[in-house]
């Protein structure tokens, strides 16, 4: 799984710099501040070296908001990566970091050219097309542990669209458009085909009593 090359929208990197999402802290491990990680990179030996500094994506209410985290050591326990970080010396501190997403600065000139990989600033502002008609525009990209979501502003409000090939089959940076093939109900309410209660056109069968139920006593 390659590094996710979609920096957070709030970060304004230099033209030759971007941020890569490389991991997520998932669970405190032991009593000395160690934390299990979920890796979003094929190169943990390059990204998670002693002294590596990560920008933290955490809620604004977190005491870690706006701070960085420096790695002391990465170990493997039963096939799972576990990180030890400066300033995180007990289980309480480790638990306060659970669900934090780790980002690193990256020189874009060192990134390999890769299809189907875009930066947030390339996607924000693109118009979203469905069946040849414009339905809205991308206003941000939300990065969740399971997948990324495109936040699309429409006349009816904001719609979150899973950024997967089946729903977003085409991104055309030159035309400043994305093509959508959303499932029913994503952009509109599904029709209610169920008959209304008391509708005489759909008679309701009387309730079945215990005596009428096969095997009832």
UniProtKB/Swiss-Prot annotation:
Residues 115-186 form the PRC barrel domain. GO terms for molecular function: ribosome binding. One of its GO terms (cellular component) is cytoplasm. The keyword Repressor does not apply. InterPro entries: PRC_barrel-like_sf, PRC_RimM, RimM, RimM_N, RimM_N_sf, Transl_B-barrel_sf. GO terms for biological process: ribosomal small subunit biogenesis; rRNA processing. Pfam families: PRC_RimM, RimM. Residues 181-217 are annotated as: Disordered. It comes from the Bacteria. Coiled coil: none annotated. Keywords: Chaperone, Cytoplasm, Ribosome biogenesis, rRNA processing. It is found in: Cytoplasm. An accessory protein needed during the final step in the assembly of 30S ribosomal subunit, possibly for assembly of the head region. Essential for efficient processing of 16S rRNA. May be needed both before and after RbfA during the maturation of 16S rRNA. It has affinity for free ribosomal 30S subunits but not for 70S ribosomes. Binds ribosomal protein uS19. Belongs to the RimM family. NCBIfam families: 16S_RimM. The PRC barrel domain binds ribosomal protein uS19. This is Ribosome maturation factor RimM.
């Amino acid at each position: 799984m390659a590094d996710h090359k979609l920096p957070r929208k709030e970060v304004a990197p230099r033209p030759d710099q971007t941020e890569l999402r490389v991991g997520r802290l998932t669970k405190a491990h032991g009593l000395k501040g160690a934390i299990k990680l979920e890796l979003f990179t094929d190169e943990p030996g390059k990204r998670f070296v002693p002294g590596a500094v990560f920008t933290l994506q955490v809620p604004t209410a977190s005491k870690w908001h706006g701070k960085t985290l420096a790695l002391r050591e990465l170990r493997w326990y039963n096939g799972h990566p576990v990180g030890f970080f400066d300033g995180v010396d007990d289980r309480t501190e480790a638990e306060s970091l659970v669900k934090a997403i780790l980002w690193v600065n990256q020189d874009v000139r060192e990134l390999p050219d890769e299809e189907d990989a875009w930066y947030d600033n390339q996607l924000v502002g693109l118009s979203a097309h469905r069946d040849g008609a414009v339905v809205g525009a991308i206003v941000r990209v939300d990065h969740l542990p399971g997948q990324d979501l495109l936040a699309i502003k429409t006349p009816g409000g904001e719609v979150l669209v899973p950024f997967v090939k089946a729903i977003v089959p085409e991104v055309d940076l030159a035309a400043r458009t994305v093509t959508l093939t959303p499932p029913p109900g994503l952009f509109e309410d599904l029709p209610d085909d169920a008959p209304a209660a008391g509708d005489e056109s759909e008679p309701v069968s009387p309730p079945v009593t215990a005596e009428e139920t096969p095997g009832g006593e």
